[in-house]
């Protein structure tokens, strides 16, 4: 129903948690190289538990290859520099949610490929830098899925 893109993720447990999230929500996960870890990393596998076999995951050599694979899809960049609040967007089946690396977020040249209404920011208290990557992915994905009455869930 939805896709999540992790652009150059750095921290194995975050990606492992998102693998588990995707497996439990029927979401396809896209990883854009370079990755900050091996897909055989113990922490990645531990965080994802035994959900790796249930996750639909694709690894892309670079951002351009990922965009080509998702051509024609509506894409949203999750960024602290966004202005659109996640709860005000009417998400559609097939939407794609793009997240940047944990320590620096999406680079400006990637963010600039998204219109302002497709740059999404999750609300948080002032003077805080950002939310955890896997938590942000869960918040956004569950809001989008909720809008579709949790289609396919038990």
From Swiss-Prot:
Alphabetical list of SUPFAM superfamilies matching this protein: alpha/beta knot
Record GO terms (molecular function): RNA binding; tRNA (5-carboxymethylaminomethyluridine(34)-2'-O)-methyltransferase activity; tRNA (cytidine(34)-2'-O)-methyltransferase activity
E.C. no: 2.1.1.207
Entry superkingdom: Bacteria
Catalysis: reaction(s): cytidine(34) in tRNA + S-adenosyl-L-methionine = 2'-O-methylcytidine(34) in tRNA + S-adenosyl-L-homocysteine + H(+); 5-carboxymethylaminomethyluridine(34) in tRNA(Leu) + S-adenosyl-L-methionine = 5-carboxymethylaminomethyl-2'-O-methyluridine(34) in tRNA(Leu) + S-adenosyl-L-homocysteine + H(+)
Alphabetical keyword list: Cytoplasm, Methyltransferase, S-adenosyl-L-methionine, Transferase, tRNA processing
Major site of localization recorded for this protein: cytoplasm
GO biological process terms, semicolon-separated: wobble position ribose methylation
Binding site for S-adenosyl-L-methionine: 78, 100, 122, 130
Subcellular location: Cytoplasm
Assigned GO CC terms: cytoplasm
Coiled coil: none
CDD domains hit by this protein: SpoU-like_TrmL
InterPro entries referenced in this protein's UniProt entry, alphabetically: Alpha/beta_knot_MTases (IPR029028), SpoU_MeTrfase (IPR001537), TrmL (IPR016914), tRNA_m1G_MTases_N (IPR029026)
Keyword S-adenosyl-L-methionine: yes
Keyword Electron transport: no
Protein function: Methylates the ribose at the nucleotide 34 wobble position in the two leucyl isoacceptors tRNA(Leu)(CmAA) and tRNA(Leu)(cmnm5UmAA). Catalyzes the methyl transfer from S-adenosyl-L-methionine to the 2'-OH of the wobble nucleotide.
Subunit structure: Homodimer.
Similarity remark: Belongs to the class IV-like SAM-binding methyltransferase superfamily. RNA methyltransferase TrmH family. TrmL subfamily.
Name the record gives this protein: tRNA (cytidine(34)-2'-O)-methyltransferase
Species of origin: Methylovorus glucosotrophus (strain SIP3-4)
Species classification: Bacteria, Pseudomonadati, Pseudomonadota, Betaproteobacteria, Nitrosomonadales
């Amino acid at each position: 129903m939805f896709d999540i893109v992790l652009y150059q993720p750095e921290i194995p447990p975050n990606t492992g948690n998102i693998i588990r999230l995707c497996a439990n929500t029927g979401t396809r996960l896209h990883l854009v190289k370079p990755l900050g870890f091996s897909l055989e990393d113990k922490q990645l596998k531990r965080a994802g538990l035994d959900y790796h076999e249930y996750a639909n995951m694709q690894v892309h050599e670079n951002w351009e290859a990922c965009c080509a694979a998702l051509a024609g899809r509506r894409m949203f960049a999750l960024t602290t520099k966004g202005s659109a609040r996640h709860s005000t967007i009417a998400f559609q089946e097939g939407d794609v949610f793009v997240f940047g690396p944990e320590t620096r977020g999406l680079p400006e040249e990637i963010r600039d490929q998204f219109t302002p209404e497709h740059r999404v920011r999750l609300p948080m208290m002032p003077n805080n830098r950002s939310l955890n990557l896997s938590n942000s992915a869960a918040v956004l994905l569950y809001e989008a899925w909720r809008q579709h009455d949790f289609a396919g869930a038990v």
